[in-house]
Amino acid sequence: MSAIVVTDQYIEYFNNPSGVIQGAIGSALAAGSVVGSAVAGPISDKIGRRDSILFACLFWLIGTSVQVACQNYGQLIAGRVLNGFTVGITSSQVPVYLAEIAKAEKRGSIVIIQQLAIEFGILIMYFIGYGCASIEGPASFRTAWGTQFIPCVFLIIGLPFLPRSPRWLAKVGRDKEAIETLANIQANGNVDDPLVVAEWEEILTVMRAENEAGRGWKKFFANGMWKRTLAGMSVQAWQVSCVPVLLQGSLS
């Protein structure tokens, strides 16, 4: 978005929006992300990791459509809120899904690749914004926003061909399907392979531990867990408060 809001075409079409309006447009994505993050867990538990990502993609298509066709600030903000809702779901469920369908020895590297892909996608969008700046009129920013359809469509097409999470299948009582999925991932379909048996036992052990531990927000702060909770929360806080601020300050 930052590559678009400084273009003459955007400024002219939206009549040189004030700082408050620009702030609302910029923060709309984060607002939607908060809602998406809050509902991601219940949705994922209900329909599974894979289908929750597919569900989020539908909101991305709607949000992008609203942005491309927007005629005023309100519509643009609404479109970005919908896109943010998608970001909130996918940012939490994609790493979980990848970890649960990957072989144990490759989980770390696969999750890292996913994060690198996000950064690479951001870089591509900057170049797209730069390239579209040469287009005359509103087609400039509408074209840039329209490219957001492309990765989403590929994801929607490809997701049905990917397996469901074995851990989610076990959680909802679909044990046979979970074991078969594990076998396809770990041992080319051999359900008696030692790796498959060990992974299945691990899943059952974790599920029993979760059931015995119970649920509730108090768990995040009881028995010294507040330190781990604070550490996890601070990662995102430091990320958005340090380097981005330094870069923005040095470029302004």
Question: Can you say where each PLM-predicted feature lies in the sequence?
Answer:
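Transmembrane-helix signature of 12-pass secondary carriers
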Residues: M1-A183, A198, T205-S252
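Short intracellular "coupling" helices and adjacent cytoplasmic loop segments at the cytosolic face
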Residues: I185-A198
